[in-house]
Amino acid sequence: MSGGAGIPDVPAFDASGVRLAIVASTWHTKICDALLAGARNTAADSGIDNPTVVRVLGAIEIPVVAQELTRNHDAVVALGVVIRGETPHFDYVCDVVTQGLTRVSLDSSTPVANGVLTTNSEEQALNRAGLPTSDEDKGAQATAAALTTALTLRELRAES
């Protein structure tokens, strides 16, 4: 289910001191480019003008690149799209990417926001890509999640 139901309002925040990286796949270029644009816009609105951006071919490559990026960044955003086809490949890819990103985040204690769309159709992906005709912008949402989590972790670590 999607369409904007339940999406929290995220107040403006200053993340200007956060080192942000974005890794985005290139399959389904129109969708991935739109996700990346939304991520860049949210970063800029939060005080980050030049996040590190790395493009990879497909979704399966995202976790290992995200892992490397956590070494020198405070937050990482993963962007891509996997659209269900006629074979079980969709399920395998989605599972590997989701588990990989979660493991990277937990192992590195660095927020890695999962903005990899997993949809049943191209139409669903387009509707979440942040295009003018889209209901949602998952690139922007993932970036806000990564940055606000990085700020929360910074506060928690300062208290210890």
Swiss-Prot record:
Catalytic activity reported: (2S)-2-hydroxy-3-oxobutyl phosphate + 5-amino-6-(D-ribitylamino)uracil = 6,7-dimethyl-8-(1-D-ribityl)lumazine + phosphate + 2 H2O + H(+)
EC number(s) from the headed UniProt entry: 2.5.1.78
Positions that bind (2S)-2-hydroxy-3-oxobutyl phosphate: 86-87, 128
Active site, UniProt feature: 89 (proton donor)
Residues binding 5-amino-6-(D-ribitylamino)uracil, per UniProt: 27, 59-61, 81-83, 114
Pathway note: Cofactor biosynthesis; riboflavin biosynthesis; riboflavin from 2-hydroxy-3-oxobutyl phosphate and 5-amino-6-(D-ribitylamino)uracil: step 1/2
Keyword Cell division attached: no
InterPro entries the UniProt entry points to: LS, LS/RS, LS/RS_sf
Leader sequence residues: none
This protein's record includes keyword Transferase: yes
Cellular component GO terms, alphabetical: cytosol; riboflavin synthase complex
An annotated GO BP: riboflavin biosynthetic process
Gene3D superfamilies, per database record: Lumazine/riboflavin synthase (3.40.50.960)
Keywords: Riboflavin biosynthesis, Transferase
EC primary class: transferase
Entry coiled-coil feature ranges: none
GO molecular function: 6,7-dimethyl-8-ribityllumazine synthase activity
NCBIfam families named among the record's database cross-references: lumazine-synth
Family: Belongs to the DMRL synthase family.
Description of how the protein assembles with itself and partners: Homopentamer.
Reported function: Catalyzes the formation of 6,7-dimethyl-8-ribityllumazine by condensation of 5-amino-6-(D-ribitylamino)uracil with 3,4-dihydroxy-2-butanone 4-phosphate. This is the penultimate step in the biosynthesis of riboflavin.
HAMAP family: Lumazine_synth
Name of the protein this chain belongs to: 6,7-dimethyl-8-ribityllumazine synthase
